[in-house]
């Protein structure tokens, strides 16, 4: 069976009309994927210290030919190109990075930056990114993000230390109270001891006075003068140191002997023990009628 030319022409037209939509879609997506795109987030910020090196990246996506990309710094409404700065490319699998180098960062680098790409006579600009440069002198005054993040942990660590002075103060107050209580008890015991000593001294003084009186009475009773009175013949006592001639005749003269007692009686009786006793003196008295 022979195919007619008209049938062949109809088949070709059918395949052409069937493939046109797919070819158009592929072509459209191909154009979209090959457009240059700059991926800088809107209102992005970077905080850096003056004197440190820094790399500002501009993510660029393209197809075959790499576009010409530049950096500029915003000054009011205009953007001044930074052609004298060091730049470089960093290629990765699905995207590339156009890098602006700061070696080192200076205080006047503070501001907003923007990258732009020139592709097929078209200028594509990115969103601006801002650099906040902190001077080294004021860096110690402004805490970093790491320090701000570590502050809660620092507070948790300092909480036990905050209770330590309170504990020390409480212990010191308790110690002072105990010392005062012991001092009061010592004062009370000293006062009671003094009162007891005063009572004992008073009793001792009374006993000393009583013994002194008894000794004086005994000495007075032991000391006497004897004569020839017949009534005194029988008045001699034991331990008497006076000797007389008893029971003499009435008309005869008699001799009486008397002893002189030099004992010391008084509060300083202890001193008398160290004093040597003088020899006893006797006196003879002749009594005549």
From Swiss-Prot:
Question: Signal peptide position in this chain?
Answer: 1-30
Q: What is the effect of changing residue 226 to F?
A: No change of phosphorylation implicated in interaction with PTPN6 and PTPN11. Severe reduction of phosphorylation
**Biological process according to GO:** adaptive immune response; immune response-regulating cell surface receptor signaling pathway; negative regulation of T cell proliferation
Q: What SUPFAM superfamilies does UniProt report for this protein, alphabetically? A: Immunoglobulin (SSF48726)
PROSITE patterns in the record: IG_LIKE (PS50835)
Transit peptide in keyword set: no
What GO molecular function annotations does the UniProt record carry, in alphabetical order? Answer: signaling receptor activity
Q: Which residues lie on this side of the membrane: Cytoplasmic?
A: 179-289
Record's comment on post-translational modification: Phosphorylated on Tyr residues by TNFRSF14 and by antigen receptors cross-linking, both inducing association with PTPN6 and PTPN11. N-glycosylated.
For this UniProt record, the keywords arranged alphabetically read as follows: Adaptive immunity, Cell membrane, Disulfide bond, Glycoprotein, Immunity, Immunoglobulin domain, Membrane, Phosphoprotein, Receptor, Signal, Transmembrane, Transmembrane helix
Q: List the disulfide bonds.
A: 34-63, 58-115, 72-79
Subunit annotation:
Interacts with tyrosine phosphatases PTPN6/SHP-1 and PTPN11/SHP-2. Interacts with TNFRSF14/HVEM (via cysteine-rich domain 1).
Q: What does this protein do?
A: Inhibitory receptor on lymphocytes that negatively regulates antigen receptor signaling via PTPN6/SHP-1 and PTPN11/SHP-2. May interact in cis (on the same cell) or in trans (on other cells) with TNFRSF14. In cis interactions, appears to play an immune regulatory role inhibiting in trans interactions in naive T cells to maintain a resting state. In trans interactions, can predominate during adaptive immune response to provide survival signals to effector T cells.
Q: What is this protein called?
A: B- and T-lymphocyte attenuator
- List the gene name: BTLA
